[in-house]
């Protein structure tokens, strides 16, 4: 089972709102997910992002792969930097 951290589209037509979720890669975009780890609202100015850092770092350490968009959101929040520092300073 390959696990991904990706966006799940919510909201109404022309007013998107996304949940950052951990899901099996085989499940559909808006289908079943394992855990919700944040939200992303691109409609507000500036875009509003909330993330559960501990949960995301735990999933990344267990092998979850973020999608390209989620990787950008995590980098802007500084979570990817924390992950890489923790991963490469253990050795």
Swiss-Prot record:
UniProt entry keywords in alphabetical sequence: Ribonucleoprotein, Ribosomal protein
GO biological process, one term: translation
Source species, domain of life: Bacteria
One Pfam family matching this protein: Ribosomal_S16
Gene3D superfamilies reported for this sequence: 3.30.1320.10
Coiled-coil residue windows: none
GO CC, any one term: small ribosomal subunit
Single GO MF annotation: structural constituent of ribosome
PANTHER family according to UniProt: 30S RIBOSOMAL PROTEIN S16, SMALL RIBOSOMAL SUBUNIT PROTEIN BS16M
Family, as annotated: Belongs to the bacterial ribosomal protein bS16 family.
Protein's recorded name: Small ribosomal subunit protein bS16
Organism: Levilactobacillus brevis (strain ATCC 367 / BCRC 12310 / CIP 105137 / JCM 1170 / LMG 11437 / NCIMB 947 / NCTC 947) (Lactobacillus brevis)
Gene from which this protein is expressed: rpsP
């Amino acid at each position: 089972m390959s696990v991904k951290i990706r966006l799940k589209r919510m909201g109404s037509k022309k007013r998107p709102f996304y949940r950052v979720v951990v899901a099996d890669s085989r499940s559909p975009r808006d289908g079943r997910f394992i855990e919700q780890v944040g939200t992303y609202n691109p409609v507000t100015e500036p875009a509003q992002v909330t993330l559960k850092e501990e949960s995301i770092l735990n999933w990344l350490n267990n092998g979850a792969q973020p999608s390209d968009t989620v990787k950008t959101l995590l980098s802007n929040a500084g979570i990817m930097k924390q992950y890489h520092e923790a991963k490469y300073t253990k050795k």
